[in-house]
Amino acid sequence: MTMRSSSPSSSSSYSLAFTSLSNRLETIFKKASELCTLCDIEACVIYYGPDGELKTWPKEKEKVRDIALRYSLLNEALRRKKSVNLHGFLNKKKNKGLKNPNKKMKTSLKNVNILKYPLADHYPPDQVSPLIQSLELHVSKFQERLRFLESQKQNQTKPDHQSLTPSSLNHYTQSLNPSQFSLFMYNHGDNTLSQIPVSASNFNQDYFSALLEESELKNQLMKPEICGYDQNQNMSMGDITNNKFQDPCVSNKEAVQESVNNFGLNQLMYKEFYGCDQNMSMGNINSNSFQNPCVSNTQHYSAVEESVKNPWLNQLMQNELYGYGYAGFC
């Protein structure tokens, strides 16, 4: 019973092995054909089956016999030069690894599934929306960074000596405070001095040149040199009410009286006519011994006395005479 039961199992295993061998034989013939085509070499396969059946590739016996004869004529060294079997192949690979123990094998850290399939296919539907939002956020950050780098590159390519932009001109104009400037126009016809309001918007070179030409301030600034005295001489303020006050540059006494009462002309008289400096003494301001070559009429000194008695004008005179500076009368 045992022998009979074992015979069908052995016959089935034998048939499976024969089928596997026949399949492998077809694969071997196919590989030999590919080697001859791709490598442009001559190759042949000689196969003997379990029952002694002979199979060759190529099927022409003459070609197989010729290749086998040439191979048999080679010496042993040439025969074993590229000859390898499974045992020899594994030993060769093992010895190669032992010769280079420090050599690192190249490994890929990427997941095979990520390379095969798209990334979004592995996410459930409820996680796809947060993933899209995260990607959009990163894209917006990259775009912003790109715009910043492009603008920085454009700024570097621009020349350094560029003209002023309107915003910089506005800033420069606003820095000129109009309250720090005063502009006076003197009329030689009626000997009057009037103050003109100047703002930062119209305080430019063309406007100022036109005012200089209209008021003839250039001629007025040249008068101290024509009259023959300089502005650095020291005069005593104790003689301001003297009847002998004279000046060859002034011929109209009514104009002098009107100009003295004017606040702006007082500044001009102290700076241009009198030529006084900050070291003058105020001790003898009401004395009658005041003299000045710029006033020709000695009878009309009452206007000068009236302007001196004015407390506001006295304070202004003290600021100029005692060294507080002329910054407010530029």
Curated annotation (Swiss-Prot):
This is Agamous-like MADS-box protein AGL75. GO terms for cellular component: nucleus. SMART domains: MADS. Keywords: DNA-binding, Nucleus, Transcription, Transcription regulation. Residues 19-61 form the MADS-box domain. The gene is AGL75. It is found in: Nucleus. The keyword Nucleus applies. The keyword NAD does not apply. Pfam families: SRF-TF. It comes from the Eukaryota. Probable transcription factor that may function in the maintenance of the proper function of the central cell in pollen tube attraction. GO terms for biological process: positive regulation of transcription by RNA polymerase II. Interacts with MEE14/CBP1. GO terms for molecular function: cis-regulatory region sequence-specific DNA binding; DNA-binding transcription factor activity; DNA-binding transcription factor activity, RNA polymerase II-specific; protein dimerization activity. Its main location: nucleus.
